Amino acid sequence: MNWLEERMPGIGRIAKDIAEHPVPSHTLNIFYCLGGLTLLCFIIQCLTGVFLAFYYKPTPEAAFASVQMITNEVRFGSVIRSMHHWSCQLMILLVFLHMLRVYYTGAFKKPRELNWVAGCFLLVLSLGLAFTGYLLPYEQLSYWASVIGAETANTLPVIGPTLKIMMQGGIKVTAEMLSRFYVLHVMILPAITIGFLVAHFIMIRVQGISDPM
């Protein structure tokens, strides 16, 4: 730390402030850990997702075969894919439970309204990550689920038809749908999610943790 302090003055103070920052005694229970557990699941998905991206091929001809290769041939591939899958399921559950806790304890009220809004966006982004990832194995179930999702988007007022075309890559389902979902899943949505997470944690640090009801 002294070596870093000489080259980056103030970093020791920042590290000490983070490590020794006090938290209210009422937060020392599992219900106040739901947000942190959600973040842990997101980190697991990022790490396992990088591993999966080394082998996955986002084309209609090769997508399913590459997933099968990861599962059956790549060393620890089945374990990594399972970790990615189940951390996603757990993350969605934890996001809902975290928001229920925040709502029940009134932690969304003034002056934390913007943090609540950021949390709502994070919920939508989490669902978007789950939905776009579902198509990537490109099997019958995931294909038709994505078609249904595009048709559901089509029912939105004003922007629905345009959104459907953007998702499908045309009037009908095309090969572009897979590549677009892949880019959304591994680049755009994670980047936006990280941005909202940073804002979320900054607001928590500035405003502090809310008092119990």
From Swiss-Prot:
Per the entry, the cofactor note is:
Binds 2 heme b groups non-covalently with two histidine residues as axial ligands. Binds one heme group covalently by a single cysteine link with no axial amino acid ligand. This heme was named heme ci.
- PROSITE patterns on file: CYTB_NTER
Could you say which residues bind heme b 2 here?
A: H84, H185
Query: What are the protein's UniProt keywords?
Result: Cell membrane, Electron transport, Heme, Iron, Membrane, Metal-binding, Photosynthesis, Transmembrane, Transmembrane helix, Transport
| Entry superkingdom | Bacteria
Q: Where do the TM regions start and end? A: 30-50, 88-108, 114-134, 184-204
CDD domains recorded:
Cytochrome_b_N
Q: Which GO terms describe its biological process?
A: photosynthesis; respiratory electron transport chain
Q: Which residues bind heme b 1?
A: H98, H200
The entry marks the following residues as binding heme c, namely: C33
Q: One MF term from GO for this chain?
A: electron transporter, transferring electrons within cytochrome b6/f complex of photosystem II activity
Q: How does it sit in the membrane?
A: Multi-pass membrane protein
Q: Which GO terms describe its cellular component?
A: plasma membrane
Q: Where in the cell is it found?
A: Cell membrane
InterPro entries, alphabetized: Cyt_b/b6_N (IPR005797), Cyt_B6_PetB (IPR023530), Cytb/b6-like_sf (IPR027387), Cytochrome_b_N_euk/bac (IPR048259), Di-haem_cyt_TM (IPR016174)
Cofactor(s), names only, from the UniProt record: heme b; heme c
Q: Which family does it belong to?
A: Belongs to the cytochrome b family. PetB subfamily.
Q: What else is known?
A: Heme 1 (or BH or b566) is high-potential and absorbs at about 566 nm, and heme 2 (or BL or b562) is low-potential and absorbs at about 562 nm.
Its assembly, as annotated, is: The subunits of the cytochrome bc complex are a Rieske Fe-S protein (PetC), cytochrome b6 (PetB), subunit IV (PetD), and a diheme cytochrome c (PetX).
What job does the chain carry out? Component of the cytochrome bc complex which donates electrons to the photosynthetic reaction center.
Any idea what this protein is called?
Cytochrome b6
What organism is this sequence from?
Heliobacterium modesticaldum (strain ATCC 51547 / Ice1)
